[in-house]
Every structure is written in C-alpha cells, then in structure tokens.
Amino acid sequence: MRKGTGIMKTPKPLLALRMVFPLAASLIVLLLGEGIARGSLSADVFASFIFPHIGAYLLAWLLLFLVWLLLDWVFRCPPLSTLGMAVLGCAPCAVNFYTLQLRGEPFLPWDLTQVSEAAGVASAAGLKIQPSMVVAIIVVLVLMAGSFFLYRGRHKQRWLPRLAGSAATAAALCLLVFGVYLQPAVTQVLGITPDAWMQDRYYRYYGVITGFMTNLTNLEISKPEEYSQEAVDALLDNVDESQKFATSPLYSTSYSAVTPKDEQVKQPTIIYVMDESYWDVSELEQYGITFDTDVSKNLHALQQTSAYGRAYSPSFGGGTCDVEFEALTGYSVSFLPSGSKPYQQHVTKPMFAMPNYLKLKGYQTAAVHCFWAKYWSRDKAYPNLGFDDFISLEDMHGVTKVRKHYWTSGLVTDDSMADQIIQQYESMKSSSDKPIFLHAVTMQNHTNYNKDNYPDDERVKVLSHPAGLKPSTVGALEDFATGIRDADAMLGKLTEYFSQVDEPVILVFWGDHYNPIDSNYDVYTTTGYASDSSADPRLHQTTLLMWSNYNQQQVDLGTIAAYDISPVMMDIYGLEEPLYFQFLNRQLRVASRTNTRGTTMNLDGTTTQEPTEFQQRWSAEHWLLQYDLMFGRGYALQRMGLAGLSGVDTGK
C-alpha cells in the first residue's frame, strides 16, 4: 500500500502482465482474423504470405493495439475494449471469407454502402459458419474473461488523465490511418505494392486489415489537366474528320467490308453472352494435356464461319463486373483507381453505354444473369447503363444447378442459361416489334474448382498430363474442363436456335477472365502455357466469337481489348457507331490493340510495359473522353444525341 494514500501498490508481475496483455491480445486477434479469412493458418501461410510481407501485418497489429488502448482510455472496461478490438479485427475477415466465396473478390471499402443488400444475398446463398470462426469466438471469450480478472481492482483514473490519454491515442490512430495507410508513397516504402490485377492476391499478401485500409485511397477520381469543352470538341472533330477519309473497315474480310452498304442489315437483334471463366481449354492439348472428349467442338466449327479472336481482359481470378463494364461501355477500368468497382462506385447515374445508345436507335434492351440481382449492384447499375429489364436468379424457376460440393446451393447451368436467353428473346419478340439487345452473364464455371463438383460419369477426364501436376490440380482441371464443355454446348444450342429464326441475329460470346486452377498456377507453368504471374498477357486473352445468322465470313480478329468488343462488333457488321466508338476503333487501327493495366499490345500482337509517346497520347485522349462521359460535364453526349444522360460534374 502506498504510504498516505490507502491505495494498494500493484505488484510488478501483475503490472507487467497488464502492459503486455493489449499487445498480446491484438496479435492474437490479428492471427484469428487471418485464419478466418483464409479458412485456416498453416506454416505455409506464414512462410509464403505473412513473413515476406511482415510490414503490412505489423501495421495491422499496431492498428488493433491502438483501438484497444483508445477504448480502454474511454470506457476503462478491458473486456469491452477486448470485444471491440476483436470485432474490428475479425468481422471484416469473416465478411472477406464469404465475399470471396460468392464473387471471387475480397471485402472492399465500397461494399460498406451495400450492407443490407449483401446480408440478403448471404442469407439466400445459405452461407455456413466456419470452424475457424467458432475457434475465434471461443478465444475472444477467453481473452475477455482473462482481461476481466487481470485488470480487476485497477484503481480508477481521473477524468483529466483519461482525456489526455484518449486524445493522445486518437491522435496516434489518425496518424497511422492518414499518415501511413492512406499515403501510397509511405506504404510502398513498407513493401506494400498495389496490385491492379488481383485484389484477392493483394489481401493474401498483406492481410485483410491492411488490404482494406489501403484500398480507401481508391475512392476519388482525378480530372485530366487538359479537360475542357474545347478539348473534347477538338478531339471529336478530329474523329469526325478522320471517318470522312476512312477507306475501309477494320477487317478486310468482314461483313461490312464485302457487303455493299445499301445491302447491309441495319438493325439486327444483338445478343451478348459473357461466359464465366471461359477460355478454350483445349489449347492445353498442345502442351501435353489430353481430355477424353472434344470440349470445344462447337467453338471450333463456328470459328470457320464467324469472326473470332481473343478479348484482352482487365481481370484475373475475379472481377467479372470489370470485364462486363468494359464490354458494355467502351470504358477502360485501367483509368480508374486500382481495386475500384465501377458498378458499385461510378455507375450511379445514367451514362453512355451500349444499351443506352441502342435504345436511342429504337432498341428494346434486357439483361439476364443467373445470380442475385443485388450483387455487384447490378440491380442499380443496369438501369443506368440502359437496360429496360433485368432477369436475375430471383426470377428464375425450374433451372438446373450443379457444382454443389463447393457451392452449397449450386450454380445455374449454362444449359439452363441458354433456355433463359431464348425465353427472354421470345418474350421480347412477342411484346414489341422493336429490335432486341439482350445481354447475359453466366455462372456455372465460377472458381473454385474441385473434382467432387461433378459425379465421375459427368466429369470430363484428363487422360494424360505432364509430370508434376498434383492429383488435386488434375481434379480441379477436370472440373474446369467440364464447365468449358458445357459452355461449348450452350454456344451450340444458341447458334442452332438463332440460325433458324426469321430475322438477322448477331451473337457475341466471350469469357470474362482466367482463374488459378486448384488455387495455383501449376496447370499453366507445368505445361509451359503461361508463367506464374497473373500479369502474364497470356492469362488475359480469353476466347472471343462474333457469329451471325446472316453472314458466314471468317474473320480473324486477333486480340482486342474488352473495351473494344462493342466498337469492333459494330464495325464488322456495318452498324452505325457513336463517335466514341469511332474513336476507339481508330485507336485500334493506328495505335494499339489494348492498353490495359500497364500492358500495351502493339498492332503486331507483341506486348510491352513501355508504350510509345504516340500510344500514350492516344491513351490520354481515351481517358479524356471517358472522363467526360463518366464523371465530367458530358460534352460528348450532345455530339452523340444523348444529351439527356448528362449529369453534374463529380470526382467522387
């Protein structure tokens, strides 16, 4: 007892434990959270992810420690401080685990604007609590109980020291958030490198807390310095002038090149199908892998009488909506902050897009997607892009679902999606004489892959493969190849149906992105197909087909950017292009095949990370027009007859 005070002096061992507890508890919570996010924590996780990027985890540890300290200064209730810190450390990790399951992307800051929608989707999807979450709850309860007994009898603090302690801790927290987390120059010094390709990998490397906090920098858009009405008008004047002297379409064998203009179809039905994770996996047969069936027989047959090539995707392993956004608009996500999601953050008002433009030309429009309407905010983004109707999973009845080993509720098959597309087409045809634009997005072949997703008698089998592939990887490849076989059957079903309708139809079919198979790159590296880098250009060129029931010209498209899918389709079929699409086709003709996420593909198909000044100028002009149409005053809209879509200037 201190002399004259009546206060018992705290024993040194107890004092030491009280000082160590918040540091230890915050470290334990950090590890619990990472275990939740990853499903488990193994020695390999520490060796491959945590230790090589230790700076990111030290920042997260410091953040949790300061949160505990601030709560303790304010409430002087250690169990409450422990609970608050644990919720902050573990809840985002649990959300991250489920968002990865549902959409292949981690928990991002802008998801906070959709809490109620996400809760509804999670409930409908039948998500289950994981063992790692149960362990975390038990450990947190033990920590809370421990803090109660450890700090019991601690003398009360007067209000002035508490106020000073609270202020100092809050200041330290602000310094950490605004002076470190939100300063890319500082985080890069700590070894935290932005990853434009794959947010999932970014979170695996740097952890959920640091990944989430650093993504807060991706909320604002910077206006191009040269942006003005004069600059936009001058650029569009140049496009207009160039078109007057254009001597030929992009491709010499295309329908528009070989068919007299007065004989060309003016308003065909246009159907887009973006197939989940689709690329022609039979290409691996050139690299030592053989399958027990021809997984792409319809594709290969149709390539003889269609326009075919590759779409350069901005995504790998996830980010389906990024690819969809590019294809529907001609906008490049490369100009947007790394990790941002256009549908959630930017498509918040009507804007120029293929559906809105076609509506101006008299089309009726609809979208079909066999997942929940609210995910990726499609229910809000689609109307702003110009879709009159949206048929989502909630509206589908009697559809077949597969792959229930990983996806508890199953995924709608591509065959059922073909039926949905045909039904929607027939419904639109019967209700209106207007031409149709119908856009569909599938789900059957979504990651993750496991041989148990299909019965043995339904799954494509790998007959031979290079040495070094693990059995689990071979099984995952069989799962993936089965999805490709079924996507090919869907393609055959659709082209067979639309070849018999009595009106002109264009069908554009492409894959959104590649994925890791069995959570690794072994299929690509062991065969020599590609490297183990998600930035490898080979892993961004998905299969693309443009077919019509009124033209049999074979056209080799080569590789084009996903944002060029709509402009190129309109060019090869001789459809009236908006000025913005004319600009994109001009860029494709003279500058580059794509400029995506730091990779430029030259006109000859070679790639570089160092574009020429000429290519950089075209890219800058692309961003100028995109900024005007997405965020600016919409000066270009007047020139395209879409002045009604013009909104107020916004940079956020």
Predicted ranges, named:
Residues 2-203:
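Transmembrane and membrane-interface helices of multi-pass
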Residues 9-13, 202-205, 228, 473, ...:
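Intrinsic-disorder-associated interaction segments
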Residues 32, 118, 209-212, 232, ...:
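Generic structural signal of hydrophobic/aromatic residues within well-ordered alpha-helices
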Residues 40-45, 77, 228, 319-320, ...:
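Intrinsic-disorder/low-complexity, polar/charged segments
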Residues 103, 112-120, 133-135, 211-221, ...:
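Short alpha-helical interface patches
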Residues 112-115, 205-209, 229, 296, ...:
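Alpha-helix initiation and N-capping motif
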Residues 246, 250-266, 272-275, 279-652:
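Solvent-exposed soluble domains appended to multi-pass membrane proteins
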